[in-house]
Amino acid sequence: MIETASLPEDQRPLAPPDSHIFRTFVNAPAGLRRYRAMTKFIREESHVPPRLREMALIQIGYVTSCVYEYTHHIKTGLASGVSADDLRAIADETDGIETSLEPLAKAVLRATREITLGFDVSADVFATLQRELGDEQLMELLFSVVTYVGTVKLLLTLRVELEERYQTYLQQFPIRPIRS
């Protein structure tokens, strides 16, 4: 992880001192710029409802036990309409426990788990998502999921440490051991 002050002046905005992910990813500044452009699109321009998008990204962090991804998106999710009940439902859905989530949210979570743990989405889930979201939102959801699955792989490979201020989210919503 690079100290922001040691970076050339033009790269400092890429790696705020309080962001471990960007202080790590800035080792490849051109790649980080493109990564940030994609994540900006996902957050600010995608037509996927923010609650569903964030539930998918939280699911990725949860199912991979990537506390960095999980806690950062809990914070973003809570600001985007994800409730504490939704967060508990993500854990329950992962364990195969019935929840009161609406069918579309369940399909988003299942598709996210299938992509994260495998390589594709089952036909029935894909059909549900296509029917409920339409082609554009479905494609944007898939862009979001595969982008953040890649992010998790980088975070885990590079062992990016969680900033202390995010520990509270992990304490409130711990990652349970995944049932097989």
Residue ranges of model-derived segments:
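Hydrophobic alpha-helical segments
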Residues: 1-180
